[in-house]
Amino acid sequence: MGLTTPFFGDFFRKLYVARFAEIVSVLIKGGIPIAQAIEISGHTLGSALYREMLHEVAESVRRGELMSQSFSRYGKFFPPLVTQMITVGEQTGKVDEMFLKVAGFYSREVENVVGNLVELIQPVLMVVIGVLVGLLFAAILLPIYNLIQVIR
């Protein structure tokens, strides 16, 4: 599933942002420099696209560019909320806390999507199981019915 497919793309973007933000928050709290934390997080996400984007963001941060400006260039993959929270973190000096809040928000978004998907799948599975039971019932009873017809 690609990041550009209508439903799954949005889901995976939220998932990657949540994982990225949580990893960066933990690394920054652990004393890792911000640019290095961004780059490390890119290697842990499992997406070549995000790895490349985060490498470019880390390089621009190393050159002295603000993180919020670097992330705003990738608005399709990092929503405005992310850049706004990073801006607040840069202004207050609490970047790690802002990343943790972003991670919490997007983790809840992912949980909501998964919960809604499960709620949609359950009725469909019940119908499929009902059809399969009906087919099994017919497969068992039709030969018996045909046998009775032949005997008469």
Task: Go through each PLM region and give its residues.
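Membrane-cytosol interface motif
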Residues: 1-16
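Short capping/connector residues at structural and topological boundaries
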Residues: 10-12, 100, 147-150
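Glycine- and small-hydrophobic-enriched helix-loop-helix hairpins
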Residues: 13-120
